């Protein structure tokens, strides 16, 4: 080995260490983010199960402010989206960009800063949110010092990702990198605009926007956080990992390009549908509704492209639980992207607005789409990152799949029924014009569905524990390895 390193260093003029480093991918950063994704997945689901229990048994607040639902709910959403989902995106994007560009990432140090900076953001959120430090904006609760750290860390990530594409050895930029790139650029734009504040203390600030403009900026951010963080980035996972696991090319590469541009153009305009029946100008609400309906076409185009990649390999779904995770994730993506445009129609929204139907919708997208595609990708990555041919237990993956799927179905079905029931009860009017039901009566009627929701969430959490055990067993049975960069210029 030393002779090889010395000869390589003689040819390149580099030190033996640098020469060896140039011949392998940086899989350490992928390994770190992959393990972090599993850890934060367990934590985020644990908090989710606890607050679901609080909705069923309010005594679990224990009269302690930092254990109250109002403080733990944003912790749950931030952990699920930015800790679990974020680490999954970072791990997969670093894996994909290196292999499709057939080069090592441009800077190991910046990548390391990205990892530790992001973990610091997560820990800061885990401390500050239960203590009550919040901006009060959904998905953007973190106060200005943490927002600055997010921005700096994000810039480091962007430099590494786009810098690696800049030094690629393959002329073509694979479509998965397009989706990752759009996710990185859009989230940076959204975060910078929505996080514009006037500090009023070390952990207190006021938005530079006011009134309805503040609401519009918030839901331009909130909707597109879903559109680019929870959609575009994870579509990058779809376009790399499903073909790899299925051992089939993307069904239609041309459709993937059309899918990309249609999605990128349309998503940015749909935010106003979150503000139907508010002080937002009616024309703006209608504009958001129209673009939401248009979104159905590119969303379903991408879903069909992913599912049809299995053409000629449908039998693999019987025997491959990892592929099953990925395809069922696409099914939930299809459900969520049909339901979203439908709920943006003002007539439908008049029933669904402020009800638990919204909870069913977002959890179908987050647990079903984001969760399942992330789990499938992690099951693909973990054995390869630790020098193993497969996960420790395929049977455990099978059990995880069915436990999590049943949990999601319980959760979503309960919240769908509860949401429609709430909407109908709230709009029910007596002949004299008075409300038929008080708000408290609607809460009482919802209670059984909260219990079912808790059971569904508990099953999903148990699935995460099974995954964590499987990952630990796989990692301890192997050892960390960095893959060798192939000499032939072909997509990996």
Q: Where are the language model's segments positioned?
A:
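N-terminal acidic, proline/glycine-rich, low-complexity intrinsically disordered segments
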Residues: 1-12
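Short, charged/polar, low-complexity loop and linker segments
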Residues: 14-21, 442-446
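Cytosolic juxtamembrane amphipathic/interface segments immediately preceding
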Residues: 18-32
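Short, highly charged, low-complexity non-transmembrane loops/tails of multi-pass membrane proteins
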Residues: 479-492
């Amino acid at each position: 080995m030393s002779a090889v390193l010395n000869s390589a260093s003689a040819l390149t003029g580099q030190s033996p260490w640098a020469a060896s480093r140039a011949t392998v991918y940086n899989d350490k950063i992928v390994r770190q983010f992959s393990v972090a994704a599993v850890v934060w997945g367990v934590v985020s689901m644990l908090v989710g199960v606890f607050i679901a229990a609080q909705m069923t048994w309010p005594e679990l607040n224990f009269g302690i402010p930092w254990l109250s639902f109002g403080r733990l709910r944003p912790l749950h959403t931030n952990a699920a989206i930015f800790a679990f989902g974020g680490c999954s995106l970072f791990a997969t994007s670093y894996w994909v960009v290196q292999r499709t560009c057939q080069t090592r990432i441009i800077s190991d140090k910046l990548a390391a800063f990205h990892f530790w900076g992001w973990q610091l953001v997560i820990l800061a959120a885990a401390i500050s949110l239960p203590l009550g430090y919040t901006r009060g904006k959904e998905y953007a609760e973190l106060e200005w010092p943490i927002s600055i750290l997010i921005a700096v860390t994000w810039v480091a990530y962007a430099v590494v990702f786009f810098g690696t594409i800049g030094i690629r050895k393959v002329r073509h930029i694979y479509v998965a990198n397009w989706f990752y790139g759009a996710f990185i650029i859009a989230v940076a734009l959204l975060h910078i605009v929505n996080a514009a504040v006037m500090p009023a203390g070390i952990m207190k600030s006021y938005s530079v926007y006011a009134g309805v403009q503040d609401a519009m900026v918030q839901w331009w951010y909130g909707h597109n956080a879903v559109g680019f963080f929870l959609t575009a980035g994870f579509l990058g996972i779809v376009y790399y990992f499903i073909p790899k696991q299925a051992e089939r090319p993307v069904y239609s590469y041309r459709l993937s390009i059309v899918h990309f541009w249609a999605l990128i153009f349309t998503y940015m305009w749909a935010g106003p549908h979150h503000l139907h029946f508010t002080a937002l100008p009616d024309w703006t609400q209608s504009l958001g509704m129209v673009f939401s309906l248009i979104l159905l076409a590119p969303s379903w185009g991408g879903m069909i492209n992913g599912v049809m990649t299995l053409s000629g390999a449908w039998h693999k779904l019987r025997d491959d639980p990892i592929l099953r995770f990925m395809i069922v994730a696409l099914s939930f993506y299809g459900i969520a992207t049909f339901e979203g445009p439908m709920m943006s129609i003002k007539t439908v929204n008049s029933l669904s607005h402020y009800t638990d139907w919204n909870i069913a919708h977002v959890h179908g997208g987050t647990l079903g789409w984001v969760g399942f595609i992330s789990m499938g990708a992690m099951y693909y990555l973990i054995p390869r990152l630790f020098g193993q041919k497969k996960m420790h237990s395929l049977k455990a993956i099978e059990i995880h799949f069915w436990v999590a799927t049943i949990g999601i179905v319980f959760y979503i079905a309960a919240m769908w029924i509860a949401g429609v029931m709430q909407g109908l009860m709230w709009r029910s009017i007596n002949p004299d014009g008075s409300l038929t039901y008080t708000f408290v009566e609607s809460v009482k009627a919802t209670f059984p569905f909260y219990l079912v929701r808790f059971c569904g969430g508990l099953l999903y959490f148990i699935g995460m524990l099974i995954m964590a055990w499987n990952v630990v067993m796989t990692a301890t049975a192997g050892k960390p390895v960095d893959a060798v960069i192939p000499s032939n210029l072909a997509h990996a």
